[in-house]
Amino acid sequence: MKRLFSGDFAHKVGYSLISVVIFAIFFAGMIFLTNPTGTILDTGWTLETAEDIRAVTLPYTEDVDEKVTRTYRVTFPYVDADTLVIPRPSANAMLVFLNGQQVYSTGNIRQPTANIWNMLHLVSLPVNLMREENVLEIVLGRDNTIGLQVYPFLASRQEVFLKISLANWLSSDFLLIAIGAALMIGVFLIRLSRTFKHRQSPEVFMGHAAILSAIYCFDF
């Protein structure tokens, strides 16, 4: 029993537990950072397509096989907020209108190819456009699964800016750093395996796994 929990085995168990704890912290952090706050726009949505206008309940997505645009529209009363947060829309281009005035755009709505679906978008709402009753329109463009998977919400920029910025860093910039690190580690392990007599060493498989994982993550 002492041998079982000593030496290299104990170290491996310790490293495994540390990895699980780190993963749990990041996972819980992402849930906390992306949790809607403030005034959540969870009811009253309509969807306008080229064929009709119909009421929908968020989250709502649909699968398409050609480039389309979808307009999500909701009416809300005046609230003390200056920022709209749109979490990870299923789209490659987006326009936002408040009371008929464009207040935000990202990607090319005619040729939607931008990677905007893994970001939480902060949209500034000009105070002079706010009324007692406000109409918000979110226009999405894409050629596959399209829609809103998370409720947009209204909040004070001061309250959400740091949280949203950190969430975007973890889901975008941090991922790029991890991809670069995985590529470097993969190349290093493959080169290291060539110094051993046995070509089929664990390092060569770990190196290829790291490189393939980095390539897969490029999709995000």
Predicted feature locations:
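Membrane-water interface of alpha-helical transmembrane segments
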Residues: 5-15, 174, 196-203
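Aromatic-lined ligand-binding clefts that engage carbohydrates, nucleic acids, or primary amines
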Residues: 76-98, 136-138
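Short, aromatic-rich amphipathic segments at membrane interfaces
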Residues: 150-173
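Beta-strand-rich ligand-recognition modules
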Residues: 94-153
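Intrinsic-disorder/low-complexity, polar/charged segments enriched in Ser/Thr/Lys/Arg/Asp/Glu/Gln
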Residues: 66-75, 81-83, 120-122, 133-135
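Hydrophobic alpha-helical transmembrane segments of multi-pass membrane proteins
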Residues: 175-193, 201-220
